[in-house]
UniProtKB/Swiss-Prot annotation:
HAMAP family referenced in this protein's UniProt entry, alphabetically: Mannitol_dehydrog
Stored NCBIfam families: PRK02318.1-2, PRK02318.1-3, PRK02318.2-2, PRK02318.2-5
Pfam family, one: Mannitol_dh
Species per Swiss-Prot/TrEMBL record: Vibrio vulnificus (strain CMCP6)
SUPFAM superfamilies, per the entry: 6-phosphogluconate dehydrogenase C-terminal domain-like, NAD(P)-binding Rossmann-fold domains
InterPro entries cross-referenced by the UniProt entry: 6-PGluconate_DH-like_C_sf, 6PGD_dom2, Mannitol_1_phos_5_DH, Mannitol_DH, Mannitol_DH_C, Mannitol_DH_CS, Mannitol_DH_N, NAD(P)-bd_dom_sf
Keyword terms of this UniProt record: NAD, Oxidoreductase
Protein's recorded name: Mannitol-1-phosphate 5-dehydrogenase
Binding site for NAD(+): 4-15
GO biological process: mannitol catabolic process
UniProt-recorded Gene Ontology molecular function terms: mannitol-1-phosphate 5-dehydrogenase activity
Catalytic activity, reaction form: D-mannitol 1-phosphate + NAD(+) = beta-D-fructose 6-phosphate + NADH + H(+)
Name of the gene: mtlD
GO cellular component, one term: cytosol
Amino acid sequence: MKNAVHFGAGNIGRGFIGKLLADANVAVTFADVDAPLVDQLSHKQEYKVKVVGSECQIDTVTHVTAVNSASEEVIDRIVQTDLVTTAVGPNVLDIIAKTIAQGIAKRFAAGNLAPLNIIACENMVRGTTHLKGEVYKHLDASLHAQADELVGFVDSAVDRIVPPAEAANDDPLEVTVESFSEWIVDEQQFKGEVPSIAGMEKTHNLMAFVERKLFTLNTGHCITAYLGCLQGHRTIREAIENPAIRDQVKQAMMESGEVLIRRYGFDREMHQAYIEKILARFANPFLVDEVDRVGRQPIRKLGMNDRLIKPLLGTIEFGTANQHLLKGIAAALKYQNDSDPQAVELQRSLQQVGVKKTLAKYTSLAEDSVEVAKIETLYNQL
């Protein structure tokens, strides 16, 4: 039986990556800082996943355990494991890099020269390549050549909506996920044998799929959230069932889709079907996904390589329509959430320096650009 160490025992870790690994007969050790969660997982060594779509089913995931990600034990697990995966959030990758580096160093010192593959499963472009840079900062330079030879840092694109568990459920380990899932990996970056895991698709053209997901699912999801907030909707489903919001979100995804079609040669009809599938996923009656969860961290989401600005830059590159994307960005600026430090910082900036300077600061768009002027106009109309 193959072994994997998975950083992040949260809903995505358990409901998506951990489940696919366990279903492929891989023994999964979750690593997390949440001590009660680690204790429950290591005690029960199984958990339930409720898969909801046109039909609902409950699967039991077995052969799992957990360790504290700040412990020496997780380093020892990396010494022996076949695979390391993560679902910790982009901001936490830099924190776990040191632990992974210590594990690699100890692995080499112990004489384990079997290939090790590491896959960051995060909502970021080339997240594993970023993680590699951070790991190498903590790895002695004398080990870099050996790591280049034996450790594969495999970029991936992941897609599955996993909302927070409902508090009414008395099983803290159970997680609800949608039936749709997509995990695409860059086949060229593996070292040694490429693992065979049902649900993990291999490709030589990862960026096409990374951007397809970022420009469609992520772009549409956050615009639904930001427009939904402005209309007083609580959940993504409520928001997308508002015809005006649904139309706006669909138009924004068609604008970003035009960039994908021109950049990567996606089939137009197939991409339109992909957009419709995503709209249907947002309306899934079994998923209670709050607009505040999807809209949180607006400063990160307004970054130049993220879900709003990157597709906009593509429309500028190809000279294509972008009015609905611009409106989505304006709606993001309107997002208010006192419990989200980024939302608070964004509102403070808008009050202190205004729309144009705030956009220039956080998005890298030029303050005097046509796009920034249009966003300011739309912002004032919302």
